[in-house]
């Protein structure tokens, strides 16, 4: 029996990213026991620490881990403000359409950090979120990420009005976010032209 259990565990851990799903389940359960956040524009903070399985060859948190941590933080953010439930009620779904991360200073093994997530703006198709890794030792912003969360079969404004039961004013789009949105649009147009999609839609 023990041999079967060990063999099954080895097969499971060898073929699936088990820790990812366990972490996701833990985040979901924790959100169930935390009080909901009514302010959809409020910044949410989750706390983390660089552990052994986060390391790269230089004993820093590896680049991929930043994106993984952002995934879980966005999930917690959307769950606690009720964004996902509102989207589901309206039969809409949300998917990540683009991310850009800028690394400013590495996070070392054992270093604690805060991951701060907030909605910075939205348009007719997408939410735009900013996520910051802030070192607990000195408050330095070690990395900052912008994320475009596309809404399918719905719109951000409709979701927010359904959630808040009132009109929610969209914050002004900052200059750096405008540049980033233009970059995404230009990249999309270039890729469509490269694949011949523009010709097919004319």
Curated annotation (Swiss-Prot):
Subcellular location: Secreted
Keywords assigned: Secreted, Signal
One Pfam family linked to the record: 4HBT_2
GO CC annotation, single: extracellular region
Signal sequence coordinates: 1-24
InterPro entries xrefs: HotDog_dom_sf, THEM6_lcsJ_thioesterase
Coiled-coil features, chain-numbered ranges: none
Highest rank taxon of the organism: Eukaryota
Family, as annotated: Belongs to the THEM6 family.
Name of this protein: Protein THEM6
Protein's organism: Danio rerio
Lineage of the species this protein comes from: Eukaryota, Metazoa, Chordata, Craniata, Vertebrata
Gene: them6
């Amino acid at each position: 029996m023990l041999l079967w259990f060990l063999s099954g565990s080895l097969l499971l851990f060898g073929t699936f990213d088990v820790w990812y799903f366990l972490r996701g389940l833990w985040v979901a359960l924790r959100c169930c026991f935390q009080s909901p956040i009514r302010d959809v524009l409020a910044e949410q903070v989750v706390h983390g620490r660089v552990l052994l399985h986060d390391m790269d060859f230089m004993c820093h948190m590896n680049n991929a881990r930043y994106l993984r941590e952002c995934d879980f933080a966005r999930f917690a953010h959307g769950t606690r403000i009720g964004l996902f439930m509102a989207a589901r009620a309206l039969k809409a779904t949300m998917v990540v359409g683009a991310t850009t991360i800028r690394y400013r200073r590495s996070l070392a093994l054992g270093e604690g950090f805060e991951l701060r997530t907030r909605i910075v703006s939205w348009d007719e198709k997408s939410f735009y979120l900013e996520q910051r890794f802030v070192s607990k030792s000195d408050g330095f912003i070690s990395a900052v990420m912008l994320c475009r969360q596309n809404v399918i079969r719905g719109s951000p404004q409709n979701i927010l009005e359904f959630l808040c039961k009132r009109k929610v004013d969209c914050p002004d789009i900052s200059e750096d976010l405008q540049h980033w949105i233009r970059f995404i649009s230009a990249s999309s147009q270039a890729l469509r032209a490269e694949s011949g999609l523009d010709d097919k839609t004319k």
